A protein has these predicted regions:
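Short, surface-exposed loop/turn motifs at beta-strand boundaries within globular domains
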Residues: 14, 25, 44-46, 57-59, ...
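Extended, low-complexity regulatory regions
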Residues: 49-53
């Protein structure tokens, strides 16, 4: 691969401006982590973490990655991704087309341990990836939520960043338990 030359007139006070960066360049990275734990006894959707980012151009895209640690002795759990522009309201993004099967829940990614032997002690590490095209230079916020696949489902308790132990949805300070993190990363990509 040939080397590229940076023109001196492209430099501003010793730095490379984002306007000069080629398409596909990473212009900024925002990272959020949730290093506490959540004990949810009902399965209802719950906020996990959020971050804000302000694109430098309307043509730029935002590449999002996330991984979450969920534990449960039941099933149907997922992560949803939401976006809010400025002080507006959140809208769900990054989900499949359920227009022909409207009973199915929309989600960014699933992270259920399922009802299997030993699921009580399992922590599932699941990940999601998404390229967003917000077409704005306003500040906006991304957030992820965890929950069961229906607001009408109750009793599908889960934990985030902790093992779910025999139906007790609280952090267990035991040698066999771990305390991982759940993350959300947003990268502005030159368009």
């Amino acid at each position: 691969m040939p080397l590229s030359k940076i023109k001196t007139n492209s430099l501003a006070t010793g730095s490379i401006t984002s306007a000069i960066m080629p398409t596909g360049s990473v212009l900024q990275v925002k990272f959020g982590k949730f290093d506490d734990d959540i004990a949810n006894t009902t399965g209802t959707e719950q906020d996990v973490l959020s971050l804000t980012i302000t694109p430098s151009s309307t043509s730029n895209k935002i590449y999002l990655t996330s991984h979450a640690q969920i534990s449960s002795i039941t099933r149907y759990h997922h992560i949803k991704l939401y976006r809010k522009i400025g002080s507006g309201s959140y809208s769900q993004i990054a989900f499949g087309d359920n227009s022909s099967e409207t009973t199915r829940q929309t989600a960014w990614y699933c992270c259920s341990t399922g009802e299997v032997t030993g699921a009580t002690y399992m922590q599932t590490n699941s990940a999601g990836f998404f390229l967003d095209e917000p077409a704005t230079t306003s500040q906006f916020t991304y957030k992820i939520t965890a929950g069961a696949s229906s607001s009408s489902i109750t009793g599908y308790a889960f934990t985030v960043n902790s093992a779910h132990y025999h139906g007790i949805t609280q952090a267990q300070n035991q040698w066999w338990n771990t305390w991982p993190i759940t993350t959300l990363t947003a990268m502005e990509i030159a368009g």
